[in-house]
C-alpha cells in the first residue's frame, strides 16, 4: 500500500501542510502507532474510530485513547461505564489504552492525522483508502477476529466483513449524543471475550494499569 499512488499524494499533502506551518496531530512517529503496537497477525479485536483528537496533547495514534495526564474524553468515559456494567471493571483514572493494543486490540482511526484544533481536517486525502486496506487484510486473515463497530460511520466502513468467520458487534457510538441509544448495555466486551475463548484464544484483559506511564516504551 505504501507504494500506491494515493499514498504518494497523501505524503505530498502532509509535507505541504507542514511546510505551511500547520501543526499536525498526532506526531509523525505516531501516525502508525496502532499498527506498531498491534501487527495484523496479532489482531484479535478491531475497534474503529473516525479521526484523531484535534486538541493539544491528546492524540497519540490510537482511536479513543489519549496520552497520560490528559482528561478522559466523554466517549471514553462511556466506554468505561459500559466496561463497568458488563465486566465489573472500575473506570480507569486515565485514558491511555496502549495495554489493550498490546493484547491484540487494533484501535484504528479511519483517518490517521488531523490539523490542530480543526476537526476532520484531513478527511478525503487518502487515509480512508489505506485504512480500508487494513480492514480488508484483517478480514482475510486465517484466524477469527471480533469487530466492534460503534456508530454508522464504522458500520459502513466495515460493512464487507465476513460474518461467517468473524464476530461483528454493532452498537451506537459511545458519544454522549448517542450512548444512551444502545451503546450502554451492549455488552460487547464480554461477548468479545466469550467468542475469543470459544476459538481457543486468550480473552482480552480490559483492565487498565493504574499507572499508565509504566505502559510507555
Curated annotation (Swiss-Prot):
Q: Supply the alphabetized keyword list.
A: Cytoplasm, DNA damage, DNA repair, Hydrolase
What superkingdom does the record give? Bacteria
Q: Does the keyword Isomerase apply?
A: no
Per the UniProt entry, the Enzyme Commission number(s) are: 3.2.2.27
Q: Which GO terms describe its biological process?
A: base-excision repair, AP site formation via deaminated base removal
Q: Which GO terms describe its molecular function?
A: uracil DNA N-glycosylase activity
Enzyme group, top EC level? hydrolase
Can you list the GO cellular component terms from the UniProt entry? cytoplasm
Q: Where in the cell is it found?
A: Cytoplasm
Pfam families for this protein:
UDG
Q: List the catalysed reactions.
A: Hydrolyzes single-stranded DNA or mismatched double-stranded DNA and polynucleotides, releasing free uracil
Q: Which SUPFAM superfamilies match?
A: Uracil-DNA glycosylase-like
Which residues does the entry assign to the active site, renumbered to this chain? 51
Q: Which family does it belong to?
A: Belongs to the uracil-DNA glycosylase (UDG) superfamily. UNG family.
Q: NCBIfam families this protein is in?
A: PRK05254.1-1, PRK05254.1-2, PRK05254.1-4, PRK05254.1-5, ung
What role does this protein play?
A: Excises uracil residues from the DNA which can arise as a result of misincorporation of dUMP residues by DNA polymerase or due to deamination of cytosine.
Protein name from the UniProt record: Uracil-DNA glycosylase
